[in-house]
Each structure stands twice: as C-alpha cells, then as structure tokens.
C-alpha cells in the first residue's frame, strides 16, 4: 500500500467517525481567526502539533502560513499573498514571524540544492532559470534569529 493509499484510508475512517453535522453546523469554529492573528513559521516537521500548543492556540484561532525557514522572499510571494488575504479578507490584526533553533535552512545552500536537483534529473536549463532567486533565498538564510529580524524589518512597512 502506498503512502497516499494509507492517508486516504485513514481519512475515510476519520470522516466516518465524525459527527455527521460537524462540517455543516460547527458554529464554534469559523474561517475567521477568532484571535485575529496570523503566524508565519517554518515548515519543519518538528513544529507540527508543537507550535500551536506552545502558544496556546486552538483550532479556529489563528491563520498559520508555513514555508521553508519562515522566509518571505519577495513583495508578492506566496506568503505575502496569504497575509494579504488574512488581513483584508479574514480580519487579522497581528502577524507573528516565528523561527526555531536548528532550522534546516541555515545549512541549505543554492549549490547543494543545485547538485541534488541535477542528481534527480532536473534539466540544467531549468535550474539556470531560477538560479538567482534560489541563491537569494537559500544562501540568504544563515541564522534563524537573524532571519526572523530581517523578515520583520522587510514586512513592517
């Protein structure tokens, strides 16, 4: 059985076990974050079911945007687009940028990524097209704390 098959089977069992009215009538939980907050954080697997508990955040209380190294790489990248929706459509008033120790992005380099991409069959021409951007975000992250400070500075205005 593949990983996808395992996940689909678990999902089927999970849905069958749920209260049938849950999806349509759950008035306790809204798409609008009740604490009017958004968090930009890392996609690190160690943060799953950890970050929210450490901040006393429950289901429906915050919007959480995850990205490698909690990086915002440009004025209209996917993170910024998500934050714009959070602010202007979902009532978010505060944004928290949260990093963590031992972030893998601190050791990631454009050179290493390029080598691994080539080894997996990505065409050199395709890599060349994104080389400058990849160098900007992969080589620009050296320390989690510094990255949080830089991200906050870049988004304050």
Which residues are covered by each model-predicted region?
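Divalent-metal-activated hydrolytic enzyme cores
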Residues: 1-35, 70-79, 87-92, 103-155
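Gly/Ser/Thr-rich loops at beta-strand to alpha-helix junctions
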Residues: 43-46, 101-105
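Short Gly/aromatic-enriched secondary-structure transition segments
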Residues: 52-58
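N-terminal low-complexity or amphipathic/hydrophobic leaders
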Residues: 30-46
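Short beta-strand segments
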Residues: 40-42, 66-67, 98-100
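Short glycine-/acidic-enriched loop or helix-start segments at secondary-structure transitions
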Residues: 48-51, 106-108
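Short, basic/glycine-rich phosphate-binding loops at helix/coil junctions
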Residues: 3, 58-67
């Amino acid at each position: 059985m593949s990983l996808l098959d395992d996940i689909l089977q678990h999902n089927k069992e999970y849905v069958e076990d749920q209260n049938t009215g849950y999806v349509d009538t759950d008035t306790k939980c809204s798409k609008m974050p009740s604490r009017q907050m958004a968090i930009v954080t890392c996609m690190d697997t160690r943060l799953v079911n950890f970050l929210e508990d450490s901040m006393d955040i429950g289901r429906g209380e915050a919007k959480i945007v995850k990205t490698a190294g909690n990086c915002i790489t440009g004025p209209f990248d996917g993170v910024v687009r998500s934050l714009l929706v959070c602010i202007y459509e979902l009532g978010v008033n505060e944004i928290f940028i949260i990093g963590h120790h031992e972030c893998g992005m601190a050791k990631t380099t454009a050179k290493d990524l390029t080598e691994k991409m080539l080894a997996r069959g990505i065409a050199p021409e395709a890599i060349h097209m994104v080389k400058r951007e990849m160098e900007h975000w992969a080589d620009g992250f050296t320390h989690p704390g510094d990255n949080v400070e830089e991200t906050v500075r870049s988004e304050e205005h």
